[in-house]
Regions:
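Short Gly/Thr/Asp-enriched flexible loops that form oxyanion-binding sites at enzyme active sites
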Residues: 60, 64-68, 167-171
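ATP/NTP phosphate-donor binding region
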Residues: 1-51, 55, 63-67, 87-106, ...
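Catalytic core of DAGKc-family lipid kinases
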Residues: 78-153
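Short glycine-rich anion-binding loops that position phosphate/pyrophosphate groups of nucleotides
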Residues: 57-60, 78, 161-163
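Gly/Ser-rich helix-loop-strand patches that form or flank binding pockets
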Residues: 66-78
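ATP/nucleoside-binding phosphotransfer catalytic cores, i.e., glycine-rich phosphate-binding loops
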Residues: 120, 128, 133, 144-148, ...
């Protein structure tokens, strides 16, 4: 089996340990820093692995998912590890699961974001955000069901995957991964009644801003814009999870959502 390994720069030591364990079992096509560009990984079909392992945190997995077409396996070396199915201490289990292809294929759809600075693909979210020195900004959101106006510091447009990230911290709802919808969540809105809006994934929305703001896609600032179009992309990404994976357990463990507490306060 052909596999590749990407790692975050400051996790090269544990990544090398993963490499040493895997190399006697699989054909390792590459072992590379995820912050660098390697277009041949995507473009050269003869070089394409059957799976790629990402050693790092959620940010590393996000970068890797955008580099490759094949499924990605996250090995947690960071903090939360929403995208990670394995710990560094579980590499032996990962080897067996790879040999038997014993995984849950967790497929997630993403957003296509069109703007004057380019076309981008958001796995978690696309954020329109004013600068610190700017006054409050007016956002106009046009869709099939009408036009909505927001007076806020910014807007977060998130996928179901991203609904448990930045949007959740802003008070937005968690959208289950299999729900065909995305959400718009305002940042520091002027009116307290302004809350998240959940939109069918069939919608294509146009967002117009009263002043130039930063467009941030999955945490990366890509430029200044006044207008963007957002819709569901035809592409999907695939994460390989252990057979024991389920979403409800993940959000309980990672962020404490929906945990049951006993009378003494313990879980």
């Amino acid at each position: 089996m052909k596999i590749g390994i990407f790692y975050r720069t400051d996790y090269v030591v544990p990544a090398k340990e993963v490499y040493e364990k895997l190399k006697s079992h699989f054909d390792i096509l590459f072992f590379k820093d995820s912050s660098e560009n390697f277009p041949e990984v995507v473009d050269d079909k003869t070089f394409e692995p059957q799976a790629v392992i990402s050693v790092g945190g959620d940010g590393t997995v996000l970068r890797v998912l955008k580099k490759v077409k094949c499924p990605v396996i996250g090995v947690k070396a960071g903090r939360l590890g929403f995208f990670s199915g394995y710990l560094l201490s579980e590499i032996d289990k990962l080897i067996e699961d790879l040999k038997n292809w014993n995984f849950v294929e967790d497929k997630r759809w993403i957003l296509r974001v069109e703007s004057q600075v380019g076309v981008f693909f958001a796995i978690n979210d696309a954020v329109l955000q004013k600068d610190v020195s700017q006054k409050i900004v007016d956002f106009t959101v046009e869709m099939t069901d009408g036009t909505f106006y927001y007076h806020a510091d910014g807007l977060v447009v998130s996928t179901p995957t991203g609904s448990s990230a930045y949007a959740l911290a802003l008070g937005g709802p968690i959208i289950l991964p299999n729900v065909e919808a995305f959400e718009i969540t305002p940042m520091a809105p002027q009116f307290l009644a302004t809350r998240s809006l959940v939109i069918p994934s069939t919608e294509k929305i146009k967002i117009t801003v009263s002043d130039m703001v930063s467009l941030v896609v999955d945490g990366d600032v890509v430029g200044k814009v006044k207008e963007v179009y957002v819709r569901k992309c035809s592409k999907v990404i695939t994460l390989l999870r252990p057979k024991s994976y389920d979403f409800s357990t993940s959000i309980k463990e990672k962020i404490g959502y929906g945990k049951m507490l006993l009378k003494n306060g313990s879980e």
